[in-house]
Every structure is written in C-alpha cells, then in structure tokens.
Amino acid sequence: SNTVIVDFDLPFGTAGLDFNQDPLQGVANALNQPDRLDPVLLERMMVRCNERLSLFAAPASLDEDYDFSTEAFEEVASKIRSTAPFVGLDLPHLWSGWVRRVLLISDEVVLVATPDLAALRNGKNLVDLLKAHRPNDAPPRLVLNQVGAPGRREIPVRDFGEALGVTPA
C-alpha cells in the first residue's frame, strides 16, 4: 500500500471506527513487542482498507494500561515508515516523551485544531516547539476542524492562522 494510517491514541483512537474496521491485532500488539516486528508481521497486523491504504488501528477497549516506552513508539514508527512511502500518525491529545519524540522525528507535521482559544494556545505551543527544535524545516500544516459549528464561539480562521504564524489549509 502507498499509505498507512497509524492510530497512536491507544485508549480512545477512532481510526478503526472511521474506517469501519475492528482488527484482532493492532498497534498496541506491536508496541508490546517492537523487537519482533518484521515486514510480514506488520502486514498481518495492519488492515488493508483498499489497494492504496492500510490502517494500523488502536485497541477498541480499555482492558489494558498502555504504558509503553518512548523507544517502543519510536521503533514501531520507524518500522512502519519502512513499509510505505506515506505514513500518517494520529497522535493522542496528551503530552509525553514519546509524543514529543515522534513529533520531532516526523518528516512533516499536520496540526488539526478547532478554532477556539484552548486550541490556539496548544497549537501555538506546538508550533513554537517545532520551530525551536526544527529551525530548518517547514512549519506544520494547519487544518481547522469544526469551523462554523453552530452555537460555538470561535476565532476567525485568518486570525487563528496569523496567531500561529501558519496559513490554514
């Protein structure tokens, strides 16, 4: 496949739901034993959505605690990156050593945010972190979600982008 979507939001990821998939194995299994992963095992753990897209889904339960090391996430991400030219990592809305590391080693970052004050603050922090640690890289792409949702106060798209120093897509 050309593209793999990896749902690293282990407890609450929705990529499996979004693609109507409920695989027996997924990214949590890979994180349990990253040293055992090879291209054949990875292929079996991923769900092929179509000829050009595969999904590496998060578990659909809270039966386990998901306390994996930064090294495990980095190793799994690296091995997945070797299987396809395009890999999208869906990261959870939390801050940890492994999230930071995955962001810093990514070729490109796409920041998805809602146009509200909390997302502006969090987005600004992420953009500033990436600028400080990746000064020669392009800024992240910005995708604003839920723009114009009824009953919600929002920051205008142009103002949001200007505050981050990034042009919204």
What are these regions (language model features)?
Residues F12, A60-D63:
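A short, flexible beta-alpha/helix-coil linker loop
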Residues L37, R44, L53, D63, ...:
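A broad, structure-centric signal for solvent-exposed, well-ordered loop/edge residues
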Residues F8-D9, A58-P59, L91-P92:
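Fold-independent oxyanion-binding glycine-rich loops
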Residues D67, E71-P168:
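Conserved catalytic-core segment of NTP-binding enzymes
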Residues P59-A60, L144:
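Short, histidine-centered active-site or binding-site loop motifs used for metal coordination
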Residues A28-D35, L62-F68, D116-A118:
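Flexible beta-alpha connector loops of hexameric P-loop NTPases
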Residues N2-V4, L53-F56, V87, R141, ...:
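Structural motif
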Residues N2-L55:
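Phosphate-binding loop that captures ATP/GTP phosphates
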